[in-house]
Amino acid sequence: MFALCDVNAFYASCETVFRPDLWGKPVVVLSNNDGCVIARNAEAKALGVKMGDPWFKQKDLFRRCGVVCFSSNYELYADMSNRVMSTLEELSPRVEIYSIDEAFCDLTGVRNCRDLTDFGREIRATVLQRTHLTVGVGIAQTKTLAKLANHAAKKWQRQTGGVVDLSNLERQRKLMSALPVDDVWGIGRRISKKLDAMGIKTVLDLADTDIRFIRKHFNVVLERTVRELRGEPCLQLEEFAPTKQDIICSRSFGERITDYPSMRQAICSYAARAAEKLRSEHQYCRFISTFIKTSPFALNEPYYGNSASVKLLTPTQDSRDIINAATRSLDAIWQAGHRYQKAGVMLGDFFSQGVAQLNLFDDNAPRPGSEQLMTVMDTLNAKEGRGTLYFAGQGIQQQWQMKRAMLSPRYTTRSSDLLRVK
């Protein structure tokens, strides 16, 4: 038995938690460089604000309607997510963190001692008490059905109280008959159009379709979905995220970069951040790649994009080695005379240990005290805030940094941003 817990309008809700003056007002969160809408609360949805709406096209409408805009505050969202997930882990013996704002909880055995709907209400109330965030809870025998139950809990929140238990077969079929097939987890626009052309219009139609027909006309993924809709668990709980195959750190610049020193600062910063992520995964890497590109949509400007990579002989997780390799790659592809829009650093070829056969000609032999130094650096930055300790190559005045003109305070992670009671 699974419960899917999903925070309602997560990014927008994180902003209103610390701004009670915004309760009941339309709130949206913008993407990198304040480009377009990536999150909106119920009040903003009621005004017709759509995901992906460009901010510069909608700012007059937002001003007239009193829509409050925020730049993406990822540091705040990550910390609030950790608080939600920690609460769920206290309430359930096993939890799979599916994304920043949703998780699957294992309820095996719970139904033997608790009413599942009451337990879902307890989850909802506890998360609300500890974080002031509202979650929808969908409960069912499979992950796909739990997703469907969660969808119903959020769509009909007033009637359901934000909790839907679909463990009853009759309730399952009643809900499935009321929902279009594209509401099913994992079914995109292309597949839903094909299903519609075959006369499969509702979720119940799909659940009742012969498995042999699905296998013949589609793939094993959709077959698994149909089995899950019938209450047959095909997707197990994954408590530990699979090991990453690569790490990418890239951004679009707030202002176009035209000079080499600024680009080198950006690449150093991205390499340092990628190395930090690598260490958090307890991995070492040998492959470091750098890419730079101009905008393909710029008028009267030639497009240029290129990448280069370095393969180290010895796996490393030391920021100094990774920055050195990334800047060497930059030197191989840099061309003056362009207005660069984006750059990034990618790490690959991971190892669980930084061990390799060395010879006299290795140019990146392990540095003495490397692990201890990186641990001190990560610990200090985690405690005092990212960027407290950084490399000189990252620069001080980073004019190219991502634009976040409407950034809210980092209320939970920066002592300087703590709320003050007057």
Please report, for each region that a protein language model flagged, where it lies by residue.
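Gly/Gly-Pro- and Ser/Thr-rich, intrinsically disordered tail segments characteristic of DNA damage-repair
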Residues: M1-R227, Q236-L237, R367-K422
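Short, charged/polar surface micro-motifs in flexible loops or helix N-caps
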Residues: F10, D34-C36, S295-A298, F350-G354
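Short Gly/Ser/Thr- and Asp/Glu-enriched loop/turn motifs at secondary-structure junctions
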Residues: Y98-E102, A140-K143, Q283-F287, H338-K342
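Short, hydrophobic beta-strand segments
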Residues: A103-G109, S307-L313, Q357-D362
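Flexible loop/turn segments at secondary-structure boundaries
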Residues: L145, A298-L299, S352-G354, Q397-Q399
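DNA-contacting surface of Y-family translesion DNA polymerases
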Residues: D183, I191-R339, V355
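C-terminal hydrophobic structural anchor segments
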Residues: D321, T327-K383
